[in-house]
Amino acid sequence: MTYDINTIYTKYKQLTKKQRQQLLAALQSQGINIVKIEAYEYTDAPGIKHLFFYFAEDSRKAIPYFLLDSEVWEKILQAIYRY
């Protein structure tokens, strides 16, 4: 699946708090133990956007979207696109 991070970032930011909680629950039900998703835009470089993921195994370690396993990233994309 192809993606544009700006589109995914915007779509995620538009989710309500309840939808974000539902998204996490849906991913967890698929065995993806994400406890937090952080949408981040660099203040000193406007337009550069990232999504960081925090997993239950080490909830203090932020993993950028581009370092995720491709299968996990595909499932996350599909889940976000459902909203």
Please place each PLM-identified region on the residue numbering.
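Negatively charged, low-complexity tracts enriched in Asp/Glu with abundant Ser/Thr
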Residues: 2-25
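Acidic, low-complexity, intrinsically disordered interaction modules
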Residues: 26-77
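Short acidic DE-rich linear segments
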Residues: 80-83
